[in-house]
């Protein structure tokens, strides 16, 4: 099978036309790849860290080392990298259920959370294993015109508020995702 010269010329023209869009993405990817590689080198990751383990995770030097790398790459205090977490909501549920206790209060500053997080909270129905079933209180600050109501934050934070939820993504709503700058403004 061969392609006509016109088809090949069109392909080259399209590739050339999209390069201004690809270059910035490729530059970011290269920068981040180098950041990860430099962090792996600084953490002294070797082939030994990728060897099989017993599966029970006792003395799993590989997992411990990779968590060290991930924490440093993302500028975090610690990282938890487990294949047992099957989704982002699963990881968030682990954090919420591990920290919040009966009588504590979780407040969403970005209005109604996305559907799977509503299940974790027990939003409309305190289902088995939800925060509401464990008597964790939940409240939310509705967004105004797709933006966080900065003037309403102080009024919604009360004595028993132990944790604040800021949902960056829009979930299934029509609002725009929050920018890092907006999150900094919320947390200032």
Give residue ranges: language-model regions:
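General beta-strand structural signal in soluble alpha/beta enzymes
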Residues: 80-83, 108-109, 165-166, 188
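Glycine-rich phosphate-binding segment of PLP-dependent enzymes
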Residues: 11-76
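Catalytic cores of large soluble enzymes that bind and process phosphate-bearing ligands
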Residues: 54-62, 83-87, 142-145, 175-178
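Intrinsically disordered, low-structural-confidence terminal and linker regions
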Residues: 1-7
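PLP-dependent aminotransferase-class I/II
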Residues: 115-118, 123-183
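Short, charge-rich binding segments
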Residues: 72-73, 84, 95-102, 130-132, ...
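Conserved beta-loop-alpha segment that forms the PLP phosphate-binding cup at the N-terminus of a helix
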Residues: 79-105, 113-124
């Amino acid at each position: 099978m061969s392609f006509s010269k016109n088809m090949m010329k069109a392909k080259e023209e399209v590739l050339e036309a999209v390069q201004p869009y690809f270059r910035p993405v490729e530059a970011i990817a290269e920068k981040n790849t180098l950041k990860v590689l430099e962090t792996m080198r600084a953490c002294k990751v070797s082939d030994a860290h990728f060897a099989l383990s017993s599966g029970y995770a006792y003395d799993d030097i590989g997992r411990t080392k990779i968590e060290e790398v991930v924490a440093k790459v993302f500028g975090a205090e610690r990282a938890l990298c487990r294949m047992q977490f099957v989704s982002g909501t699963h990881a968030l549920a682990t954090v919420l259920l591990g920290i919040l206790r009966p009588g504590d209060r979780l407040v969403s500053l970005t209005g109604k959370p996305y559907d799977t997080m509503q299940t974790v909270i027990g939003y409309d129905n305190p289902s088995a294993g939800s925060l509401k079933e464990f008597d964790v209180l939940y409240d939310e600050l509705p967004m105004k015109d797709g933006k966080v109501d900065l003037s309403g934050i102080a009024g919604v934070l009360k004595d028993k508020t132990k944790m604040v939820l800021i949902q960056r993504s829009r979930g299934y709503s029509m609002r725009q995702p929050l920018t890092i700058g907006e999150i900094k403004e919320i947390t200032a």
